[in-house]
Amino acid sequence: MTLWVLGLNHQTAPMELRERASFVGDALPRALDSLRNLPNVNEAALLSTCNRTELYAETTNAQMLLNWLEQHRPGLQNHLYQYRDAAAVRHLFRVATGLDSMVLGESQILGQVKDSWSMARTHGTLGNTLDRLFQHSFSVAKHARTNTRIGTNPVSIASTAVRLAQDAFSPLNESTVLLIGAGETIQLAAKHLSEGRVQRLLIANRTHAKAQMLASQHGGYALPLTELNLHLAEADIIFSATAAPTPIVTQSNVESALHIRKRKPILLFDLAIPRDIETEVGTLTDAYLYTIDDLERAVEENRHSRREAAETAEAIIELQVKRYMDTLQAQAHQAPLRRLRTFGTTTRDELLTRARRQLANGRPAEEVLEQLAHGLTNRLLHPPTAALREAALANNTELVRAAEQLFPEKPGYHHPTLQTTIVKTDETDPAS
């Protein structure tokens, strides 16, 4: 089996394609159920965020994964990257650490990777390989963030958006802010806004209890999502990040809000994929709409300031990739060693039981011991001897050289066991 990663992100695909590629809401568990039924796919996990959609799988057939992706999210082939084995391990480590993020070093992605791992476990698509890989990525991310400055003054898309809002509406203590959603992105935005002492904070969410909890934490007011349009006109700044499959803030609703506000400007941040706010809102006079792709330009300064820390983190990841692959290789070699030991102990126990039975029946001990010795020799060495003969006939020099390393011939010395075995296997039934 081979480890594969297929995906696209903000570097390979524009927002319109990332929107089409995403698995949000019920689409994610349905996709995992579908992957579980694919032949030759042992394990799978899906990571779907506003900036990336990635499929992690252990399979012998990468083309099957491409076909599955084309069936469920058509038209992405020219924007996909593919990583295999060590490259796949390296990619996940970089993603979890924040080195592959739009905001270099942002911490939110680690929580999203953990959510992906948890969802795959819940739906039975995670086995030992991916489980071990994902958990190791958590450790690598923690190590990199602890031992470099990549995590200093944590930055996220949410914090970048709040900083832009502060620049546009300074001070925030004279502004009303409306948050739509209650997920991690909105939670981060609420935290940064409360630190900026926003005058009034409104939180609308489909699950009202979650909105109430978030509002109580940050001194805000909770609204049912069904009343959203009634409060749009109150907001100077709007942040939206839900998992809705279609936009929930429309051009007509914002136009109505601007009319009520007597054309007082509204600043809107759409932090969702798929988008929460209709693109046409950005064409309205006095409505200023920023999307995730717009924020990429704003975070470029952060990327440069963290470059040195990122280089150190990259070195840590390279070391961790090597260690992880070395461990996998060692574990792969353990399997034949375990089979060899099992074969040896099973053969020993079987022939020893037969010998004891013969002794109990009064057969001479010398005769029983001799038969036991010959039986062990034949049983244990017949398979490798037969394999070496076939290798010699097929000119498989690699296997022959391996045998020479296992049984080196010293000057003037012939390995008695090997010599005896070859003679005996010619003359004796190996099952005797």
Curated annotation (Swiss-Prot):
Pfam families: GlutR_dimer, GlutR_N, Shikimate_DH. It is an enzyme of class 1 (oxidoreductase). It catalyses: (S)-4-amino-5-oxopentanoate + tRNA(Glu) + NADP(+) = L-glutamyl-tRNA(Glu) + NADPH + H(+). One of its GO terms (biological process) is protoporphyrinogen IX biosynthetic process from glutamate. Residues 410-432 are annotated as: Disordered. It comes from the Bacteria. Keywords: NADP, Oxidoreductase, Porphyrin biosynthesis. Possesses an unusual extended V-shaped dimeric structure with each monomer consisting of three distinct domains arranged along a curved 'spinal' alpha-helix. The N-terminal catalytic domain specifically recognizes the glutamate moiety of the substrate. The second domain is the NADPH-binding domain, and the third C-terminal domain is responsible for dimerization. Homodimer. This is Glutamyl-tRNA reductase. It comes from Xylella fastidiosa (strain Temecula1 / ATCC 700964).
